[in-house]
Amino acid sequence: MTLGPVARDADTAAFFDATASGQFLLRHCPACDAISAPQSAQCERCAATGLDWRPASGDATLVSWTVSHGKPGTDPVILCIAELAEGPWWWARLEAAEPEALSVGAPLRIAYRHPAPDSEVVPVFVPDGAAAATG
């Protein structure tokens, strides 16, 4: 199963500008200093709007995963939920060779992939220490 094209809109432009340069952005609340997931329109702690963007460290911890089996003739894909070092949870593809070797709490890193010429660069997770080359 391959990653399909991902398109930006006005709400995601800053996020995808950052992923294109190898950076993952989170939402920051100037009112209470809380960090929220990138898709947040208001602060998850105080409900303030007017959030700004802050770069994430790229470190994460595996919370859960599943193996998705696509159409016949395609390779299965590992999809995961990871807790970012800054607190928010994010789900994405996990590029790991052996799903059987995964364990809750395993350290992960964010890597970036450009799945198609007409697609935005998207974040994926890789086991910490794995090559994080863009491709």
Predicted regions and their residues:
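Short nucleic-acid-contacting surface segments enriched for D/E, G, S/T with interspersed K/R
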Residues: 96-109
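OB-fold/S1-family single-stranded nucleic acid-binding modules
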Residues: 114-135
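Residues immediately within or flanking Cys/His clusters that coordinate Zn2+
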Residues: 23-26, 33, 39-40
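Short, cysteine/histidine-rich loop/knuckle motifs that typically chelate Zn2+
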Residues: 28-31, 42-48
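Short functional micro-motifs and their immediate structural scaffolds
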Residues: 37, 50-52
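Short, conserved beta-turn/loop elements at beta-strand boundaries and strand-helix junctions
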Residues: 66-71, 114
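Conserved hydrophobic positions within beta-strands
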Residues: 60-62, 94
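Short aromatic-glycine-enriched beta-strand elements
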Residues: 70-81, 119-122
